[in-house]
Amino acid sequence: MPARGGSARPGRGALKPVSVTLLPDTEQPPFLGRARRPGNARAGSLVTGYHEVGQMPAPLSRKIGQKKQRLADSEQQQTPKERLLSTPGLRRSIYFSSPEDHSGRLGPEFFDQPAVTLARAFLGQVLVRRLADGTELRGRIVETEAYLGPEDEAAHSRGGRQTPRNRGMFMKPGTLYVYLIYGMYFCLNVSSQGAGACVLLRALEPLEGLETMRQLRNSLRKSTVGRSLKDRELCSGPSKLCQALAIDKSFDQRDLAQDDAVWLEHGPLESSSPAVVVAAARIGIGHAGEWTQKPLRFYVQGSPWVSVVDRVAEQMDQPQQTACSEGLLIVQK
């Protein structure tokens, strides 16, 4: 049908009539931007979401056709989730990204195991902390301590003692237990299988967000004058770990398997150079009888991020070694 507006006026800038052909409903593309030329369309014409627009230069037509074909091919190969994350800006936005976006996040079943087993299983896993501005901090766990519950004289739950302070130790596996020491430092624990049992996270190998960790540590230091903290000093201790990740009492009793500000991810498998895990006495345990020297602290041998190295435990007779998850070797005492 002829274009509306009558004949074009002569002279400079005159409008030329354009022939427009509407496609049948069955040939309409699903949405703008993924148009495909119907079989009855003229070569060299541009097809939009709803109609065919008149003749256009052949080189431009070919370029547009090639671009649309590449787009269509890529969209067919992507999952809906991949298409969402490939949209510019969405990958970094805290509103379009959540812990569920991390396929390696460890669920509640991971934490539902005895304290000693969980303490060993933690090694090599990655602790993630998301700050309010969307910044994510990551660190690989390299040192833990197991506390076995009421029978353990060094545990806060010894004798079955349950108070508002240690309630997190008696909640479901994966619950955070954060407590204050010396009136100014925090320690991060995770409840395990068994009432009153938990695992203390002692040290991390910083992986992501090191400068932010350094700033957080410096903001809480008594004196910021002098040398800057080295990378190995950022998370080499339970309280340093909490400072570097901005973890305080407000995290107490949160669910590590469900929380949107802190969670645990699978660590990378490094089977090419498996680590050796040492079992040694826990740190700072006094007046706990035989429990003082029980080898319930576990750390990756040779890691520069471990808080305290036990040379005696490392130099004992060659222990039996068995493979475990994440490519680590466990030293059996």
Swiss-Prot record:
Claim: Isomerase is one of the keywords in the record: no
Gene Ontology biological process: base-excision repair
Region: Disordered, residue numbers: 1-42
SUPFAM superfamilies from the UniProt entry: FMT C-terminal domain-like
Gene this chain is encoded by: Mpg
Protein name: DNA-3-methyladenine glycosylase
Phosphoserine modification, residue list: 98, 272
Enzyme class, spelled out: hydrolase
Catalytic function, reaction form: Hydrolysis of alkylated DNA, releasing 3-methyladenine, 3-methylguanine, 7-methylguanine and 7-methyladenine
Keyword annotations from UniProtKB, A to Z: Cytoplasm, DNA damage, DNA repair, Hydrolase, Mitochondrion, Mitochondrion nucleoid, Nucleus, Phosphoprotein
Database matches in PANTHER family: DNA-3-METHYLADENINE GLYCOSYLASE
GO cellular component terms, semicolon-separated: cytosol; mitochondrial nucleoid; nucleoplasm
